[in-house]
Amino acid sequence: MRVTDFSFELPESLIAHYPMPERSSCRLLSLDGPTGALTHGTFTDLLDKLNPGDLLVFNNTRVIPARLFGRKASGGKIEVLVERMLDDKRIFAHIRASKAPKPGAELLLGDDESINATMTARHGALFEVEFNDQRSVLDILNSIGHMPLPPYIDRPDEDADRELYQTVYSEKPGAVAAPTAGLHFDEPLLEKLRAKGVEMAFVTLHVGAGTFQPVRVDTIEDHIMHSEYAEVPQDVVDAVLAAKARGNRVIAVGTTSVRSLESAAQAAKNDLIEPFFDDTQIFIYPGFQYKVVDALVTNFHLPESTLIMLVSAFAGYQHTMNAYKAAVEEKYRFFSYGDAMFITYNPQAINERVGE
């Protein structure tokens, strides 16, 4: 399978730079996995598509203000993008600079360069940075950090992004990108879903900056997936098994929820799914055997990205590419602040040949 098999033409004008005024007012393209049939509507139509007893699984990670600006004490501007908080004082980060800092280099961070930090070690593409400050990493980031908007949102971050680029149920700080399918859920919609009898559960996957890295190989089987930390606690496992037992569906809100659930299923030894607290490098592309997820709420993804590959493995390659072609023709809004899809699983997708 070639990366170019997942390419499609996308006019620049369809990339959303701001969200809709109301979270749940975006458009919704529904794709019936088995048949490929498409239905156009609005996000609140989800209420009619879910049944009492269905289980929605959300990712409750919270985006941290992970982008820092400053300079090396020796001179030279730098941009730091936190990949992971290691503890209260240390981070793994990507550092953009004309010349990469060496271990021991002193960094002056923040618009007023008031925060002192030291680059202590390098681990491949990542730099280990230690803050020389009384405050915790999270407090420092909340004080001087910028929201890490994706590279395709071509504007500086604004104060409003601190809430707009968060789900309303975000709880555990640690992500450097939002699980964007969840951005469309507001409290009124969540309340209506609960009133209908739809069950809800929460996994945690701290989305890393690697989610925006392009696939740099020609053959997708050669791609090495970035690592992210995920938690699937016992209460989620119980909710999944109970939903399956009563004949209801497990509906993942976002690809990060998919990756969390399917990672927990892959690692399970005795049951369909078991608790999971670990890093995951799961790479889902056509040919993957889904074990847990029956339906998916997701945004529109970048051409040639690992996420459009995940969707193709779920709905079928041809159905997915046809849906994206229709979305472009109908001028849906793309990417993080864009519109959404509701997709049901296509059990025949695993047998489909791509690029032959």
UniProtKB/Swiss-Prot annotation:
Its main location: cytoplasm. Its EC number is 2.4.99.17. InterPro entries: QueA (IPR003699), QueA_dom1 (IPR042118), QueA_dom2 (IPR042119), QueA_sf (IPR036100). Pathway: tRNA modification; tRNA-queuosine biosynthesis. One of its GO terms (cellular component) is cytoplasm. It comes from the Bacteria. Keywords: Cytoplasm, Queuosine biosynthesis, S-adenosyl-L-methionine, Transferase. It is found in: Cytoplasm. Signal peptide: none annotated. One of its GO terms (biological process) is queuosine biosynthetic process. Monomer. Belongs to the QueA family. PANTHER family: S-ADENOSYLMETHIONINE:TRNA RIBOSYLTRANSFERASE-ISOMERASE. Transfers and isomerizes the ribose moiety from AdoMet to the 7-aminomethyl group of 7-deazaguanine (preQ1-tRNA) to give epoxyqueuosine (oQ-tRNA). This is S-adenosylmethionine:tRNA ribosyltransferase-isomerase.
